[in-house]
Amino acid sequence: MFVDRLIESVKAKKTPVVVGLDPRIEMIPDFIKEEAFRRKGNGVEGIAEAMYLFNKGIIDAVYDLIPAVKIQVAFYEAYGIEGFKAFFRTAEYAKSLGLIVIADVKRGDIQDVAKMYSKAYLQNPLFDAITVNPYMGEDSMVPYLEDVEKFGKGIFVLVKTSNRSSKDVQDIETKKGGYVYQEVAKMISRLSKVIVGKYGYSSIGAVVGATYPFEAKILREEMPRCYFLVPGYGAQGATAEDVVNCFDEEGYGAIINSSRGVIYAYRSDFWKEAYSEYEYGQAAREEVILMTGMINNALVKRKYIAS
């Protein structure tokens, strides 16, 4: 079962940190682009090669530290078929090193179409879990739920996202007295009862933004069986203290994603004096170690205060 594998990897690595592989060609080190363009030319094939080589360097640097990577498909789709090849190659390489692979695809459509999305990703052995948009209702999620159970995969359903304007829709008050995001949470919590692993968590998880710690506390109570995928740490402004409400009392229940903050750490003010572009992987590794320490310390502090 996906969620059991995830929890066991989190325990083994002693970190909830997930690295997002969102390569932007303009931010990839020049030496990688030069090599990729030498091999494949400076068109889309060369760009896709540069993205893959960059990702491979990040994975090599952090795979022993983290339980999973999250690959955002949009950064690859932008380059057509060649971009998709880089997307799948990245997933394959991460899997070869024992990492859990989350495809951040945010799919959502009517049930008949959702079957095809689910076939494309949840029935693909390269991917362990995907992100899903629930806006079209419960029946649109049925194909994903069926494949989660049949193939031992997972989904993370968008509930309260990290972007600033998420409140425009997700915080609309309902006739029942709560907010839209709470109604989605209730639906996900109900669905999560069907597929529960040996640690008490479900393979039906939720996306809950680190930039909304107050709402995260509410949602942790609303969805006690749901593992949270938490974006918004680092580049979007959330801190270790902001994410603690996503965790249960034992320090589990959430994985915290950082994309730009890790993969472009070598360009940050904090690390750029210590690491050159040739050492981008080492900078990423140090950022993961720092992030892990900060989150774990924040969790210890919360537990101490609570006691």
Curated annotation (Swiss-Prot):
Keywords: Decarboxylase, Lyase, Pyrimidine biosynthesis. It catalyses: orotidine 5'-phosphate + H(+) = UMP + CO2. The active site is at K106 (proton donor). NCBIfam families: pyrF_sub2. GO terms for molecular function: orotidine-5'-phosphate decarboxylase activity. Transmembrane segments: none annotated. Gene3D superfamilies: Aldolase class I. CDD domains: OMP_decarboxylase_like. SMART domains: OMPdecase (SM00934). The gene is pyrF. It comes from Caldanaerobacter subterraneus subsp. tengcongensis (strain DSM 15242 / JCM 11007 / NBRC 100824 / MB4) (Thermoanaerobacter tengcongensis). This is Orotidine 5'-phosphate decarboxylase. Its EC number is 4.1.1.23. GO terms for biological process: 'de novo' pyrimidine nucleobase biosynthetic process; 'de novo' UMP biosynthetic process. Pathway: Pyrimidine metabolism; UMP biosynthesis via de novo pathway; UMP from orotate: step 2/2. Belongs to the OMP decarboxylase family. Type 2 subfamily. It holds the Pfam family OMPdecase. The lineage of its organism: Bacteria, Bacillati, Bacillota, Clostridia, Thermoanaerobacterales.
